[in-house]
């Protein structure tokens, strides 16, 4: 998977095309990610101990990983991801600027 939790990404297709956000969760086995503020759905919840009110909540739903691209830390544009070995470790790099994406 070319993106991971904490990456700043842009949605490149679908109803939320053009929106930017941070990845909150990644599900590699399903090839899906949850992006902050993207693909919002209404969830109906029963009253519980934690939420005695219950009601309708807005929350993010997973979207396919092919619909997001990481943002280049240098330019802020979308970029493809490359891989490079530095000091014996494999790191992700932005193809546009060559900057390392891994923190």
From Swiss-Prot:
Please give one Pfam family short name: ribosomal_L24
List the coiled-coil residues: none
In alphabetical order, the GO MF annotations are:
rRNA binding; structural constituent of ribosome
GO CC, sorted alphabetically, is: ribonucleoprotein complex; ribosome
Q: Indicate yes or no for the key word Ribonucleoprotein.
A: yes
**Which terms under GO biological process does the entry name?**
translation
* NCBIfam families documented for this protein: rplX_bact
This molecule's function is given as: One of two assembly initiator proteins, it binds directly to the 5'-end of the 23S rRNA, where it nucleates assembly of the 50S subunit. One of the proteins that surrounds the polypeptide exit tunnel on the outside of the subunit.
Q: Which family does it belong to?
A: Belongs to the universal ribosomal protein uL24 family.
Q: How does it assemble?
A: Part of the 50S ribosomal subunit.
Which protein is depicted? Large ribosomal subunit protein uL24
Q: What is the lineage of its organism?
A: Bacteria, Bacillati, Bacillota, Bacilli, Bacillales
Question: Which gene does this sequence derive from?
Answer: rplX
């Amino acid at each position: 998977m070319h993106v991971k939790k904490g990456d700043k990404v842009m949605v490149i297709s679908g109803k939320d095309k053009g929106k930017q956000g941070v990845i909150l969760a990644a599900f590699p086995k399903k090839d899906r990610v949850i992006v902050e503020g993207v693909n919002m759905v209404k969830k109906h919840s029963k009253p519980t101990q934690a939420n005695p009110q219950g009601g309708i909540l807005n929350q993010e739903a997973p979207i396919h990983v092919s619909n997001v691209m990481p943002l280049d830390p240098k330019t802020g544009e979308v970029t493809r991801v490359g891989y490079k070995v530095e000091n014996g470790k494999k790191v992700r790099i932005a193809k546009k600027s060559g900057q390392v994406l891994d923190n």
